[in-house]
């Protein structure tokens, strides 16, 4: 029997507004353990403290929004890493790219628009994590694996450019109603794995072809004041009811100590999703794991299927708090998606 224990939903506002209650000096999780002071700190990362800034157009990336410049942008990331780290800056303008891989000591600051290619060939097949299993699948637009202190920041936009991918999905689904999420080949927007002390702040994360943000086997991860959006209708002319399929806002997969604070989420699927693995032997597979100590607060939801969803690839979820949030059009505040094949 799956153990989903000690879930607390406190001060969830469905309509209108509510007075914020004064918090106790020492906060606790639902099981009575003391909440670490890390969760009280919503201070933004000071980009100036992250080291030298590498403005991509100063290092060979052109001001041309019509050509895919993956190689040139990746070269800037690689140079920053060789030089000891720093901030890769996307300036004003639109820059088209495929999969980018960040390295230890490098960070991403977006002022303009970093836009994903509509060609799946620009996203290599790699060993990754998707839908509760470790397998070969396409890299995301922004990838960070095994990093300590990685930061995405800025008032700009990371745009997945998903329309082509969404339309292909609905064409496949109309031809074959059994078409799965992975049958339609689509990249995610951001994928952070095996990392710690990660902050994603202020940035606009929009139009993801697949899941918008996916964080796996990581700890002490913060999403602060992000704007996360994918259309919920009118992406496929034969059926205007169709939106961006499987565009979850934030998928938290086998992670501990995650905070989502002050974010806006409007997507054609679930908002914050807890995942961990699937299958008969899911709890025996070392690539799977629990989600523990997850705090979601001060967020606003537009149209979403579930504000907080557990599953369907979920194992043991403990000490989860959703509080002081506002929803306009959510189908559900809390949704349990149970799988008969998973203990």
Question: Where are the regions a protein language model picked out?
Answer:
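Transmembrane beta-strand segments that form the barrel wall of outer-membrane beta-barrel proteins
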Residues: 93, 308-310, 334, 338
């Amino acid at each position: 029997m799956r153990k989903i224990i000690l879930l607390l939903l406190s001060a969830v506002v469905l309509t209108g507004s509510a007075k914020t209650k004064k918090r106790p000096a020492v906060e606790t999780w639902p099981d009575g353990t003391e909440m670490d002071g890390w969760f009280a700190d919503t201070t933004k990362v000071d980009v100036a403290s992250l080291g030298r800034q590498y403005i991509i157009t100063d290092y060979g990336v052109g001001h041309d929004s019509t050509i895919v410049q993956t190689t040139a942008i990746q070269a800037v990331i690689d140079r920053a890493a060789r030089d000891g780290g720093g901030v890769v800056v996307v300036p004003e303008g639109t820059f088209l790219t495929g999969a980018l891989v960040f390295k230890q000591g490098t960070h991403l600051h977006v002022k303009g628009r970093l836009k994903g290619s509509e060609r799946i060939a620009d996203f290599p097949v790699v060993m990754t994590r998707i839908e509760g299993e470790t397998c070969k699948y396409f890299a995301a637009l922004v990838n960070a694996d095994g990093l300590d202190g990685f930061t995405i920041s800025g008032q700009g936009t990371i745009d997945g450019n998903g329309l082509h991918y969404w339309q292909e999905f609905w064409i496949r689904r109309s031809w074959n109603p059994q078409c799965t999420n992975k049958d339609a080949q689509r990249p995610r927007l951001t994928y952070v794995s095996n990392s710690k002390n990660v902050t994603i702040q202020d940035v606009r994360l929009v139009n993801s072809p697949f899941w918008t943000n996916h964080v796996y086997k990581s700890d002490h991860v913060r999403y602060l004041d992000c704007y996360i959006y994918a259309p919920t209708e009118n992406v496929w002319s034969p059926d205007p009811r169709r939106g961006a399929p499987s565009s979850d806002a934030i998928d938290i997969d086998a992670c501990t100590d995650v905070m989502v604070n002050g974010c806006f989420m409007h997507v054609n699927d679930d908002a914050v999703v807890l995942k961990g693995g699937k299958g008969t032997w899911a709890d025996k597979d070392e690539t799977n794991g629990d989600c523990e100590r997850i705090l979601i607060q001060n967020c606003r939801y537009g149209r979403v299927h579930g504000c907080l969803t557990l599953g369907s690839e979920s194992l043991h979820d403990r000490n989860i708090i959703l509080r002081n949030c506002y929803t306009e059009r959510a189908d559900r505040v809390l949704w349990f998606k149970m799988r008969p094949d998973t203990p």
